[in-house]
């Protein structure tokens, strides 16, 4: 029996790899949601001529566009969806690594944090809200939100990570929003979880493969923080999918890790 997946944030990086791997499953129907369909070159190349992948355009910041995308998915899926994977996030190259001290002024810090919150935190709320009618109509009722151990206070402190300020704070809010949804939906048989992929080198598809600063940051983390192991998207998503496929209602509200190094 076909299993339907919607991957929000599928144009590059981890989301793109989700689509690639899911598309190889003969019983999977994949709905890839991207902010800019014309600009999703890596996705277009990956899914060319694949009949089980459908691409739709929506921005998680714009709840109306997410609702339109959900209706477009429903028109193909018969109004149902089995699994929602929320990967959309704000990862803007070197800027994402900034700590409080790295901003020129408070206005710049405020703007960065607000923008990150809209995408990373409110985007989760918008995504789940839009696809909830389809998930309710389906038998599986799984929601996986991509989180990060970098949003867990004791991990941040133990590893000595004062940077990633806007990203980490907004992802912490996203993980809390996921917990709220897990509570709200538990009596309906849903399984709503956060999933931390660990340290994944996505530079080949996010436009930063030639940025020496980003490469150095990844190498430094890999070297100085042995709790994290730098993985490829293929390695990470392979494990993530095993976790997603094994989820059951008893796992509702959980935080799972796909990477070798658990929290410090």
Predicted regions mapped to residue ranges:
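Rossmann-fold cofactor-recognition segment
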Residues: 47-64
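Hydrophobic structural elements of the Rossmann-like NAD(P)H-binding subdomain
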Residues: 85, 144, 192-195, 205
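N-terminal Rossmann NAD(P)H-binding glycine-rich loop of SDR-like oxidoreductase domains
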Residues: 11, 15-20
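Catalytic loop of short-chain dehydrogenase/reductase
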Residues: 90-125, 136-187, 199-202, 209-211
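Conserved SDR Rossmann-fold cofactor-binding beta-strand/turn motif
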Residues: 34, 191-201
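Conserved glycine-rich Rossmann-like NAD(P)H-binding loop of the short-chain dehydrogenase/reductase
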Residues: 23-41
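C-terminal helical subdomain
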Residues: 194, 211-264
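Conserved Rossmann-fold cofactor-binding substructure of NAD(P)-dependent oxidoreductases
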Residues: 61-78
């Amino acid at each position: 029996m076909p299993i339907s997946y919607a991957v929000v944030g599928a144009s590059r990086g981890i989301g793109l790899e989700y689509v690639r791997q899911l598309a190889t499953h003969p019983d999977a129907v994949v709905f890839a949601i991207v902010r800019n369909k014309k600009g999703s070159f890596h996705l277009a190349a990956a899914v060319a001529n694949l009949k089980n992948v459908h691409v739709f355009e929506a921005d998680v910041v714009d709840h109306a566009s997410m609702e339109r995308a959900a209706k477009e998915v429903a028109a193909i899926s018969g109004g149902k969806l089995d699994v929602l994977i929320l990967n959309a996030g704000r990862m803007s190259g070197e800027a994402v690594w900034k700590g409080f001290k790295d901003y020129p002024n408070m206005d710049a810090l405020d703007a960065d944090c607000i923008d990150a919150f809209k995408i990373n935190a409110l985007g989760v709320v918008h995504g789940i809200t839009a696809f909830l009618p389809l998930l309710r109509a389906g038998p599986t009722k799984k929601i996986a939100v991509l989180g990060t151990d970098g949003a867990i206070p004791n991990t941040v402190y133990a590893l000595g990570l004062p940077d990633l300020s806007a990203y980490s704070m907004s992802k912490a809010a996203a993980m809390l929003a996921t917990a709220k949804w897990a509570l709200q939906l538990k009596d309906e048989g849903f399984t709503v979880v956060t999933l931390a992929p660990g340290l994944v080198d996505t530079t080949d598809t996010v436009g930063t493969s030639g940025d020496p600063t980003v490469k150095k940051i990844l190498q430094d983390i890999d070297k100085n923080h042995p709790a994290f192991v730098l993985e490829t998207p293929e390695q990470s998503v392979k494990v993530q999918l095993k976790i997603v496929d094994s989820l059951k209602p008893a796992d509702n509200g959980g935080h799972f890790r796909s990477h070798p190094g658990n929290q410090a």
